[in-house]
């Protein structure tokens, strides 16, 4: 455990001599290289000399991390050559498995691999069902929108991530038949199970905003969204093109993936325009660009501690707050917002519009016997077990777990689900309880992140606050390294392979 904390500590270390490395690709214009005061450092006295001697160049990160990465690789060696999982051929014959996992996203891969690593399953005992050809690291699309990552670098072929010991059905799901312990695939085949894990994520409904699909598809429009692979790289080009006018960033009412993401791209765009001389936070009225945040929610963030910090930041930086403004239509350069309680709709003119569409459960989940009234898989908030069918489980975005829908949440949900499922297979009572942990590394500018961590009830549960006594509501450069470098690396290196448990570190 000490090794893992040392690794994380290196990402927490202040890199004050390299402000330019945080600038957006084309916005490294004339940024004044001012040194951050020692009051913002985590350990200003003990490591000042170490910083001077060894950390003058940002590339030293790789040199310092090398022995730790090597030690981790030795502890969890990868096969020098691995065979690909093969998709099951089309056949009308019913197949049976001990566990069927519906979904090959973050939750599906983490859970299926954790089950396999238990050593209790033979070849084809576990089946994974997913129609996708590619797996995407979706939290990275914010960085694509900010111009610091490419979307191609953040995806992997699905077959490369599926262990060859799994039976992989590269198909959609037609129906759930929980009374018969089976599902039907999109091609009509039937698959039987002893236990079912339903983790297909949620769908993004671009059609929920009238005119949005057409605006996104128009290469000449300055309308974009970080929430899709086909649109996330359009975001930065729109930010670059805007020289003056009104920029509006939206967030819908209701459930979405990572409720902090709509703000992340706002703050990165603001910082870009600030560096380009197009926005002055201290005097926004005189700036060529005006910035508004239109959210269907009543506040900046649902967790009170971080919501207060972000509201103070909004006011300090001169961003207009349009609360309980839910985008319903885009027509040319006009955006129309619904208001609560029958109030009259509001129409605003824009020159740039970043849209977060409404989201919700897939129809094959919503219309099934597994769903609650809202359409999510109805599970116990602690055990992740279905409230009606004892051999059905769910986690992640598709579940009814009343917490934020983030990849970080899955790092805590998956071990609980796997532990309880295995005990259930042995005829034992479930005894692991999920506490609602979730996290949102909220980028507040190029080079700084506010690291929100919380559990059920909106109560902060801060990893580094506990370890080092720091306030994670204060944006820090060290957290930016986690967001930009560490999290994408550990995601594909460990999380989807079932060996990363978030704040608890690596697992066997």
Predicted regions and their residues:
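FAD-binding core/adjacent interface of flavoenzyme oxidoreductases
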Residues: 66, 77, 83-96, 166-275, ...
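Beta1-alpha1 glycine-rich phosphate/pyrophosphate-binding loop at the start
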Residues: 90-167, 255-304
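N-terminal mitochondrial targeting presequence
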Residues: 1-95
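FAD-site-proximal beta/loop scaffold in flavoenzymes
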Residues: 208, 216-243, 350-412, 422
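C-terminal auxiliary extensions adjacent to catalytic cores
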Residues: 451-508
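Short glycine-enriched, charge-decorated loop/helix-capping segments at active-site entrances
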Residues: 141-148, 213-214, 221, 370
């Amino acid at each position: 455990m000490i090794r893992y904390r040392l690794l994380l500590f290196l990402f927490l270390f202040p890199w004050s001599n390299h402000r330019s490395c945080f600038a957006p690709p084309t916005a490294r214009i004339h940024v004044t290289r001012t040194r951050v005061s020692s009051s913002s450092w985590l350990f200003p006295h003990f490591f000042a000399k170490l910083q001077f001697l060894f950390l003058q160049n940002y590339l030293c990160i790789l040199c310092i991390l090398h022995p730790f990465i090597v030690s981790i690789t030795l502890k969890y060696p990868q096969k020098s050559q691995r065979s690909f999982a093969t998709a099951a051929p089309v056949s009308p014959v019913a197949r049976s498995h001990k566990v069927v996992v519906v979904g090959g996203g973050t939750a599906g891969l983490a859970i299926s691999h954790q089950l396999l690593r238990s050593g209790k399953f033979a070849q084809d005992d576990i089946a994974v069902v997913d129609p996708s050809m590619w797996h995407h690291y979706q939290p990275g699309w914010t960085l694509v929108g900010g111009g610091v990552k490419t979307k191609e670098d953040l995806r992997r072929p699905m077959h490369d991530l599926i262990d060859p010991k799994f039976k992989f059905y590269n198909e959609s799901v037609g129906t759930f038949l929980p009374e018969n312990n089976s599902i039907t695939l999109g091609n009509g085949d039937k698959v039987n199970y002893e236990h079912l894990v339903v983790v297909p994520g949620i769908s993004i409904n671009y059609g929920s905003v009238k005119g949005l699909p057409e605006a996104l598809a128009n290469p000449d429009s300055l309308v974009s969204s970080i929430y899709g692979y086909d649109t996330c790289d359009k975001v930065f080009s729109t930010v670059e093109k805007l020289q003056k006018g009104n920029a509006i960033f939206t967030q819908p009412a209701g459930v979405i993936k990572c409720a902090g993401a709509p703000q992340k791209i706002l703050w990165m765009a603001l910082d870009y325009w600030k560096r380009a001389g197009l926005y002055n936070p201290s005097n926004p009225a005189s700036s060529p660009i005006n910035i508004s945040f239109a959210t269907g929610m009543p506040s900046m963030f649902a967790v009170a501690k971080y919501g207060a910090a972000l509201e103070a930041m909004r006011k300090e930086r001169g961003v207009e707050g349009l609360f309980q403004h839910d985008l319903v239509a885009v027509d040319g350069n006009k955006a129309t917002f619904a208001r609560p309680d029958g109030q009259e709709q509001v129409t605003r003119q824009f020159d740039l519009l970043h849209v977060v569409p409404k989201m919700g459960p897939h129809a094959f989940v919503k219309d099934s016997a597994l769903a609650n009234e809202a359409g999510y898989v109805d599970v116990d908030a602690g055990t992740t077990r279905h409230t009606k069918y004892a051999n059905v489980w769910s986690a992640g975005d598709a579940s009814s777990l009343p917490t934020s829908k983030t990849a970080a949440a899955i790092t805590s949900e998956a071990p609980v689900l796997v532990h309880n499922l295995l005990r259930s297979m042995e005829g034992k009572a479930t005894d692991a309880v999920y506490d609602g942990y979730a996290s949102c590394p909220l980028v507040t500018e190029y080079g700084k992140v506010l690291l929100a961590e919380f559990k059920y009830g909106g109560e902060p549960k801060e990893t580094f606050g506990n370890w080092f006594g720091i306030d994670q509501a204060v944006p820090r450069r060290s957290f930016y390294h986690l967001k930009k470098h560490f999290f994408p690396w550990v995601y594909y290196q460990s999380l989807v392979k079932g060996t990363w448990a978030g704040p608890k570190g690596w697992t066997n």
